[in-house]
Amino acid sequence: MARIGDGGDLLKCSFCGKSQKQVKKLIAGPGVYICDECIDLCNEIIEEELAEANDLGLVELPKPKEIFDFLDQYVIGQSSAKKSLAVAVYNHYKRIQVGEPSTKGREDAVEISKSNILLIGPTGCGKTYLAQTLAKMLNVPFAIADATALTEAGYVGEDVENILLKLIQAADYDVKKAETGIIYIDEVDKIARKSENPSITRDVSGEGVQQALLKILEGTTASVPPQGGRKHPHQEFIQIDTTNVLFIVGGAFAGLDRIIEARSGKQGLGFGAQLRSTTEKKAEPSFADVMPEDLMKFGLIPEFIGRLPIITSVENLDQEALVQILTKPRNALAKQYQRMFELDGVELEFTDDALEAVADQAILRGTGARGLRAIIEEVLLPVMFDVPSRDDIARVVVTREVVLKNVNPTLVPREAPARKPTRERREKSA
């Protein structure tokens, strides 16, 4: 504790002006004093700034190849989409890192615009999972929104601001953290304009939603009701800047392949139509060939397409890819079910032809990787019901017949422990 001066006056904190009697501790320096309360306040300020720096990703940003390799551990195939996403995400967060503090006050500073991503491909091919895995790697808030539930403001349905509310909730209402998050908008093909020509009647769940999304995609300060706007109209709004929010927009875009085929001249009618050989007919147009004009014909408005400069696609998964999805990734389905049986002290084995049969069933159902779990659940349901109640089973073997013909899996019993010879038996043998 600092001592009382010669004049009899109490010493005071040089920062807040409180006397030594008003505080617990007063620390003296060369001509200055600081109290314990001001020290605590300084610590809080430093901790907040450090936390904010970490939330904004001001740590070492993984390089595109590192992002690609991380995605490879969880997502099978789709190399083109993974490369596009890795580069886009790296550039986006590099823009956030470098763009804010270093360019302030510089007249020659170049302002880098945001590049959102459009991800096209059939259902069950990993669009949502790719976005989830990216957010997991970067440790940023992540929210998934369904475009089919959205309507234009003033109509029954969800407002586009509800998408931002999900992101804020994912960040535990830390707005600064949410402002550097990732939002995945699924089923965006369902908000396509009903016809190529503008209609007199309002298209509140199609073109109207596209128009409403434009501002938040581009970057704006949006007012978000913390409890949803329509049920609680009288509430304070949360202000969130979407300039640094990365939007990944995905959809199956059924029928887009025919538009691509027609544009590329692979399809024709009449006497002037170009005939194709059998092999050419088998080669279907790829979503990788999509052009902005194809998306406009599908029903997306030019302004909406313009805010999604990066267009990439995922392709249908073949049998080999689906078998790899079942076995290779860290969280592969086969590994998950083997672990569940292991908890009951039972070994679960899938034969190679059984895995191929599961993959074939998923292709037949048209559900892609998303349908694999449902098929395995159907196959394993009887044994998952019985096994926990029995202690005589050592191993369960699933074969092709089990998957295709609804046969029960093979149950391998435990070996009975060797019986010790009794005294009577030993005497007889002697």
Curated annotation (Swiss-Prot):
Keywords: ATP-binding, Chaperone, Metal-binding, Nucleotide-binding, Zinc
Record Pfam families: AAA_2 (PF07724), ClpB_D2-small (PF10431), zf-C4_ClpX (PF06689)
Span of domain ClpX-type ZB: 1-54
NCBIfam families associated with the record: clpX, PRK05342.1
Family: Belongs to the ClpX chaperone family.
Alphabetized PANTHER family for the sequence: ATP-DEPENDENT CLP PROTEASE ATP-BINDING SUBUNIT CLPX-LIKE, MITOCHONDRIAL, ATP-DEPENDENT CLP PROTEASE ATP-BINDING SUBUNIT CLPX-LIKE, MITOCHONDRIAL-RELATED
Assembly and interaction partners: Component of the ClpX-ClpP complex. Forms a hexameric ring that, in the presence of ATP, binds to fourteen ClpP subunits assembled into a disk-like structure with a central cavity, resembling the structure of eukaryotic proteasomes.
Protein name: ATP-dependent Clp protease ATP-binding subunit ClpX
